[in-house]
């Protein structure tokens, strides 16, 4: 066994492997739990919908800005992952209204949330959908059963296998698209 440690991160490990290092045990410590690339996580609350007093519906709300990246997506939303049926790889993630339904046998048009003139047509029958959001709490009660550590590991391995190689590379990776449904695009 050949081990390496001391301030290892993904870039150094990738470089050592590219140089042909025969290391088979990696001691990643500090850089496993910290992020040099993004040491702070910025989070801001933005109102997206208000529940109507008279019924169960949500009234969509939007924050407008001259900077298109700061314009919010209005409404009560959910997110689906779109997989390519032939390869099982991720085509895009789709933000849509919570009560939207989709027919996988029909064409779907999805819109870039920032550069809204960019749209993609996905041919019906070539994709499958999986909703990503699951309820954790409902009416103040926990309704979620957490998977075991080994189940979480298996889920991570399965999901990593759905990424294209181009999105997994460290240098200049392709992005996984996160787009809007046609309905959400038109509401926005």
Positions of predicted regions on the chain:
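Gly/Ser/Thr/Ala-enriched C-terminal appendages of enzymes
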Residues: 8-188
């Amino acid at each position: 066994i050949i081990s390496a440690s001391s301030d290892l991160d993904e870039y150094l490990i990738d470089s050592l492997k590219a140089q042909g290092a025969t290391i088979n045990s990696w001691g990643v410590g500090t850089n496993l739990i910290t992020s040099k690339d993004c040491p702070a996580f910025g989070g801001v609350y933005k109102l997206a919908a208000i529940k109507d007093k008279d019924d169960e519906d949500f009234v969509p709300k939007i924050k407008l800005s001259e900077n298109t990246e700061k314009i919010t997506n209005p409404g009560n939303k959910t997110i689906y992952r779109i997989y390519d049926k032939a390869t099982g790889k991720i085509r895009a993630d789709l933000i849509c209204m919570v009560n939207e339904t989709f027919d996988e046998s029909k064409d779907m048009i999805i819109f870039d949330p920032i550069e809204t003139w960019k749209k993609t047509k996905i041919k019906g029958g070539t994709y499958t959908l999986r909703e990503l959001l699951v309820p954790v709490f409902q009416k103040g009660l926990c309704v979620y059963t957490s998977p075991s550590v080994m189940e979480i590991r298996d889920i991570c391995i399965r999901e990593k296998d759905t990424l294209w190689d181009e999105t997994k590379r460290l240098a200049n990776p392709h992005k996984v698209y996160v787009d809007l449904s046609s309905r959400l695009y038109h509401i926005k």
